[in-house]
């Protein structure tokens, strides 16, 4: 009896939000969520998460290390709307209010295997000095009501932003049945099964 052809393929993603560089800020935490097309659906794992608060390392790097795990599996019938991960970094201002310190997004790598990505972050800016002062005084900085707009792009061209910091991500990507559906993402359809990356740690 012939084996039925698969009707969907799987994309399995694990890894971690490893660390960040924000020279001007300390005591930060990170939120992540995935954005994907209408033909995609999560089948296992978590689509979003929030990390612990971390402080800068005491060495010359002054890195903010989270090592916050990512683990999610998607199914789809076509690659359109390939998942992106959206990051939002928050921390206290001088008044102790939680304010956004950076947004960023990147596509999940298309090829199976282990990947490292460093994402430049940005924050929305007020359009006038008066608005800047008012938002600083009131403790309410400009931010997106839905961080997922960072991955979508509509209306971004009319938003004033400022570059600020970097976040480093580690991905382990595995695909299943993409080749059977006619999609070629690499030498082997199930490559990418690797052991976990060692966590980044501070030098002794």
Curated annotation (Swiss-Prot):
Keywords: Cell projection, Ciliopathy, Cilium biogenesis/degradation, Cytoplasm, Cytoskeleton, Disease variant, Joubert syndrome, Meckel syndrome. It comes from the Eukaryota. Its main location: cytoplasm. It holds the Pfam family B9-C2. One of its GO terms (molecular function) is hedgehog receptor activity. The keyword Cytoplasm applies. Residues 9-127 form the C2 B9-type domain. Residues 182-204 are annotated as: Disordered. Signal peptide: none annotated. The keyword Cytoplasm applies. Component of the tectonic-like complex, a complex localized at the transition zone of primary cilia and acting as a barrier that prevents diffusion of transmembrane proteins between the cilia and plasma membranes. Required for ciliogenesis and sonic hedgehog/SHH signaling. Belongs to the B9D family. Part of the tectonic-like complex (also named B9 complex). It is linked to Meckel syndrome 9: A disorder characterized by a combination of renal cysts and variably associated features including developmental anomalies of the central nervous system (typically encephalocele), hepatic ductal dysplasia and cysts, and polydactyly. This is B9 domain-containing protein 1.
């Amino acid at each position: 009896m012939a084996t039925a052809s698969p009707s969907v393929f799987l994309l399995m993603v694990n890894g971690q939000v490893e660390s960040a560089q924000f020279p001007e800020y300390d005591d930060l935490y990170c939120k992540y969520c995935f954005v994907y097309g209408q033909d995609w659906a999560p089948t296992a794992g978590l689509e979003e998460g929030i990390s612990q608060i971390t402080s800068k390392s005491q060495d010359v790097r002054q890195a903010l290390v989270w090592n916050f795990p990512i683990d999610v599996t998607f199914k789809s019938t076509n690659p359109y709307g390939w998942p992106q991960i959206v990051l939002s970094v928050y921390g206290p201002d001088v008044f102790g209010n939680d304010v956004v310190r950076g947004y960023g997004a990147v596509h999940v790598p298309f090829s199976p295997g282990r990947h490292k990505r460093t994402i430049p972050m940005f924050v929305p800016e007020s359009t006038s000095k008066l608005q800047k002062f008012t938002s600083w005084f009131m403790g309410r900085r400009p931010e997106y009501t839905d961080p997922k707009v960072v991955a979508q792009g509509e209306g971004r061209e009319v938003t004033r932003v400022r570059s600020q910091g970097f976040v480093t991500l580690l991905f382990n990507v595995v695909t299943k049945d993409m080749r059977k559906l006619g999609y070629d993402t690499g030498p082997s359809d199930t490559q990418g099964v690797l052991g976990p990356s060692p966590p980044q740690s501070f030098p002794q």
